[in-house]
Amino acid sequence: MALRSFIFLLPSLRLFTSARDITFPPVSGYSSQQIIPQQNLGIDVTQAKFAGLMTYANLPYVHCLAPEGQDVVPFDIAILGAPFDTVSREPPVDSILSDSVGCTILEKFNNRQGVTARPGARFGPSGIRQGSSRISPAMAWSIYTGENVFVDWAKIVDCGDAPLTFLDNSAALKQLDKAHEIVSARPTNSSDRATPKIVTLGGDHTTTLSALRSTHRHWGPVSVIHFDSHLDTWDPDVLGGGISHYAGVNHGTFLHIAHEEGLIRNTSIHAGIRAPMARPKGDLRNDVRCGFEIVKAREIDQFGIAGVIARLKSRVARTKIYISVDIDVLDPAFAPATGTAEVGGWTTRELLSVLDGLEGLDVIGADVVEVAPIYDNPGETTVLAAAEVVHSLITLMVKSPS
């Protein structure tokens, strides 16, 4: 029986033997291929656009807030992030109430937000940098002017973000004040300029207050060109609700406060305004008292881009100028990622055209604020627009007479 089984398996064994005897042709691989030479290719990995630490437009990072005594590379224009939201307010100790059984009552305060709609602007600086990742200083030549401001006279750097606490808004603003003070006191790279200029990436619009305090320290009161859908000159007793002085400092009252502190001139102007007011007459009276004129959003249809530019230039002529751009000046179709969106705004092209038309003004500071990336669409429409607005603001600074 065993012999029969062996005889039956014998053909199969012959097959296995034959398989082992098969000789395959030599594999054509690395041994027969010419290796591409790796030397003398001039490969440069120092300017990778999508690698390394993210900075605005892939600019060099400088630790502008380095401790005293540590050397910092001189620069002329600095990008400074302000990751700040006036939300989750914690009241001052003397404002805390107690109920009849001694339990702390915080609901009245904790339910109050400093932003009037959606929070999230603290992530604006990182979002704007993300939107600028396609920009490279060596390849930023304007199709309109044939110029590249990144390779002009100014050394432009990204200082990163100011380290701001997210637990105490009052302390965070003091930190931002200090950050602006340090950065603006750094030595310039150009011998023709004594003070670096700062472009702030917000953050909610309250951050502009720290920037204006900084510009006042070096240049005195400035005219403000304020691109926004809201006035932002509201009396703190109106928008803050009269709850406390602490609650009255927010992104809708900062221009009122700046006026009270003597930081801005009575030659300032809004552009793109269209949001409802809290008081039909009182808000406008207070706005005039704070030194502002208004270009309403729909007036761009009446006067055109050239007409808007002319009004802005006429209003701030022969003064030092700070430009503040709330991204909600754009229609939500072009910038959905913002805290308090208002329909009926400008297009991205209209805003950029107006900004570029301000060339020749003495711009000494600027910001882009209220970008809340969490509400953006998959195409990142808002952060792309904000990044390009920053580019235009840098251009105005480079071409500024001082």
Task: Place the predicted regions along the sequence by residue.
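Fungal secretory targeting signals
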Residues: 1-20
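Conserved alpha-helical scaffold segments that buttress catalytic/binding sites
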Residues: 20-106, 110-402
